[in-house]
Structures are given as structure tokens and as C-alpha cells.
Amino acid sequence: MSSLDKTMHFDFNQNKGKNIRDTLEDVYKALEEKGYSPINQIVGYLLSGDPAYIPRHNDARNLILKHERDEIIEELVKSYLGKDK
């Protein structure tokens, strides 16, 4: 079986959940303060990977760039499904 036939396994550090949650809350607040639609801007960033969707205001861009987008998406899915406990 070639390596292309194998399923990849993601295993993220369990302690990052709170940090990602805190980061998203801080980014959300910064976007609100700047008058943007926070959900639209965060989704735009997550889909495109373009940090220009996140302002530098209150260091929001640097904060969100500390996390991989796939880790953020994983936390969002776990939270949505109630599996974040």
C-alpha cells in the first residue's frame, strides 16, 4: 500500500483549545471595534488564509497567526458539535 492510500491522522495538542478560543474572542472584539462583521471576516480568513481579513488593531492579526487554520477549524467543529469538553 503506498503512502497515498493511507489516511492521514491529525492529533492536536488538547491544551490549545482554550488558547484558540481566547484568540478568537480577542479577534472578534477587535473586528467589532473596527466596525467589521466579525464572523464574515474570520470565515474569509479561514477559507483563504489571507491575514488581510484580520486587522492589526489590538494585535489581532498576530494573535490569529499563532494558530494554524486547521487547528482553528478543528476547535470550531468540536465546539459546534459539543465535543469540546
From Swiss-Prot:
It comes from the Bacteria. PANTHER family: UPF0297 PROTEIN YRZL (PTHR40067:SF1). Belongs to the UPF0297 family. This is UPF0297 protein Ldb1606. It comes from Lactobacillus delbrueckii subsp. bulgaricus (strain ATCC 11842 / DSM 20081 / BCRC 10696 / JCM 1002 / NBRC 13953 / NCIMB 11778 / NCTC 12712 / WDCM 00102 / Lb 14).
